[in-house]
Amino acid sequence: MAVPKKRTSKSKKNARKANWKRKGYKAAQKSLSLAKSMLKGKTTSFVYSIYVDDE
């Protein structure tokens, strides 16, 4: 089984964690922006169906 030989430094660990959090923040902002534009009816980036079949 592969085992790292030395500990990862705090700065490297913090940098990786910050990058991971930044990616999540960007994805959340993008989805929120898309949802807002859908509610306002100003979407131009994709096609979606307005009508929902109620059963």
UniProtKB/Swiss-Prot annotation:
It holds the Pfam family Ribosomal_L32p. InterPro entries: Ribosomal_bL32, Ribosomal_bL32_plant/cyanobact, Ribosomal_zn-bd. Transmembrane segments: none annotated. It is found in: Plastid, Chloroplast. GO terms for cellular component: chloroplast; large ribosomal subunit. Keywords: Chloroplast, Plastid, Ribonucleoprotein, Ribosomal protein. GO terms for molecular function: structural constituent of ribosome. It comes from the Eukaryota. Residues 1-24 are annotated as: Disordered. GO terms for biological process: translation. Belongs to the bacterial ribosomal protein bL32 family. This is Large ribosomal subunit protein bL32c. The gene is rpl32.
